[in-house]
């Protein structure tokens, strides 16, 4: 697999389209950090790391509106890819839907949102947009 983050986002998108409640994805440290951010910002209901074998899996419980059955995640968009890395400085942090969405940034201080990176005045690689 050449791009594990794109695979992770695609698995989430496919589960949302199929209205699944839970999706299992292969674990990695970067995927764990992205999942934590999605949980903290309220885009997913819950998550659990399952240690089975050398890699393990992440069980992600997707969040749906109880009335309309609409998912909290409208779009997951991969920005940086192995073939074309996208970096940004703290002064040029992307605003996703005028601040309503978020960009997930990989920095020297770890994985964080675009707002957190701008507050700490550090740039990094723009992994994806979530809204």
What are the residue ranges of the model-derived segments?
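Core subunits and conserved enzymes of cellular information-processing
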Residues: 1-131
């Amino acid at each position: 697999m050449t791009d594990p983050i794109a695979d992770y986002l695609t698995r989430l998108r496919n589960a949302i389209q199929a209205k699944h409640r839970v999706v299992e994805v292969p674990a990695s440290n970067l995927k764990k950090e992205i999942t934590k951010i999605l949980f903290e910002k309220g885009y997913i209901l819950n998550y659990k790391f399952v240690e089975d074998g050398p890699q393990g899996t992440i069980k992600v419980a997707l969040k749906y509106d109880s009335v309309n059955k609409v998912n909290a995640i409208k779009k997951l968009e991969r920005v940086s890819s192995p073939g074309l890395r996208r970096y940004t400085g703290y002064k040029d942090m992307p605003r996703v839907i005028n601040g309503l969405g978020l960009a997930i940034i990989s920095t020297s201080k770890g994985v964080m949102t675009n707002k957190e990176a701008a507050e700490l005045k550090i740039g990094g690689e723009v992994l994806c947009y979530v809204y």
